[in-house]
Structure formats: C-alpha cells, structure tokens
C-alpha cells in the first residue's frame, strides 16, 4: 500500500470511529438546501480527515463536501465526503459511511470507503485491485439488467417526475431495486458484488 492509500485508510478509520462514537448524538443540524443537510458530526469528521491529509501532504488539493475547495489546481486532489448518508445518520438509521477518493492529474488513483457500523474498510488502488478488510473482492459478473439487483437513490438535483420515471424504468427492467440512502454503502456493495 502506498503512502496516499495509507493516509486515506487511516483518515477514514479515524473519522469513522468518531462518527460511530457519536451515532445518535447529533447536536446541530444545518440546512444546506431544500433537501440537503449537514450536522456538527459531518463538519468534525471532515476536519479529522483534512488534518490527516495536510499533515502528510500539505500541498495536495482538497475538494470536501462541507468545507468546499482548497488548492484544487494541484496534481493531487483528495475528494472527501466525511459522512455519506447524513439523512440516515440524523434519523439513527445505521446506513452511512466515510468516502475518500484521490485523483492524480484528473485520474482516480485510490479510494477508500469505511462503514463504521460494521467496521468494514473498502480500499482500492489503481492497478492493485479492491479489498474489503484486506481480502480481495470483485464486482458482480451479471450483465443482464433483468437478473440484477440494483440501487437507486433520489437526488436533490432532479425533479420528482424525472426521478419517478427513472425508478419506474429500473423497477420494470431489473430483478430488484434497493434504495439505501448512502452512496458509500451502495458503492461498497457494488465493489464486492452484493449489488450489480
């Protein structure tokens, strides 16, 4: 594991432990838009991650869910969602995760998802494959929608009419459709072949 992936793993785990320790203890909820929120936990977890990155890689750029952009013209850019699934977290639904991606010259080179509730760490590095808790994983080999279990998530960017049309098409064509409320959880399930 290279230094970048090592820091991403350490930062995700540290933020994830903080999030897990504060599950059910949200003190502050800030509205970021019509159907988008951030909590005090989102902000503190993001700070944990950014501090870990800056200690080791002070010149790298950062694009973070809560605090925005910093030095994004750099060769290396870290993309951070400290608490993906905030709505679930606010409602004490244990489906959320920490998501960190690293881009080098506009190409993804490493990614980490940490699921605090299950202590599951998903890590991938360009050219080295993907792993769950240090065990190699792979995506599903299903290539027909009618045999696939897929995920759909509503988005604040699209109208309800557009979302219902897309969901209807998926529901008609897929074997099964899930809505989990956390892209990090969905992507981790795709990475290990639980979702197609």
Regions found by a protein language model. Name each.
Residues 108, 136-138:
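Short, solvent-exposed loop/turn motifs
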Residues 15, 19, 42, 53, ...:
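Residue-level signal for inorganic ion chemistry
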Residues 72-131, 148:
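DPxDG-like acidic metal-binding loop motif
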Residues 138-196:
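An extended, acidic
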Residues 1-83, 165:
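N-terminal subdomain of lithium-sensitive/metallo-dependent phosphomonoesterases centered on the IMPase/IPPase/PAP
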Residues 30, 70-72, 105, 123, ...:
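Solvent-exposed alpha-helices and their adjacent loops that cap or buttress functional pockets
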Residues 60, 128, 174-175:
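A structural micro-motif
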């Amino acid at each position: 594991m290279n230094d970048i992936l090592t820091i991403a793993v350490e930062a995700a785990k540290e933020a994830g432990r903080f999030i897990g320790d504060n599950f059910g203890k949200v003190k502050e909820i800030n509205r970021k838009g019509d159907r988008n929120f951030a909590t005090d936990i989102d902000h503190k977890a993001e700070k944990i991650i950014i501090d870990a990155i800056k200690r080791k890689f002070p010149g790298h750029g950062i694009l973070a869910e809560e605090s925005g952009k910093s030095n994004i013209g750099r060769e290396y850019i870290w993309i951070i969602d400290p608490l993906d699934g905030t709505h679930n977290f606010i409602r004490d639904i244990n489906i959320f995760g920490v998501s960190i991606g690293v881009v080098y010259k506009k190409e993804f080179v490493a990614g980490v998802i940490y699921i605090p509730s299950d202590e599951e760490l998903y890590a991938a590095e360009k050219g080295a494959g993907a792993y769950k808790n240090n065990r190699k994983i792979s995506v599903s080999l299903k290539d027909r929608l009618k045999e696939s279990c897929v995920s759909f998530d509503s988005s604040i960017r699209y109208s309800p009419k557009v979302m219902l049309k897309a969901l209807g098409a998926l529901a008609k064509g897929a074997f099964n459709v899930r809505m989990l409320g956390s892209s990090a959880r969905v992507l981790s399930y795709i990475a290990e072949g639980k979702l197609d």
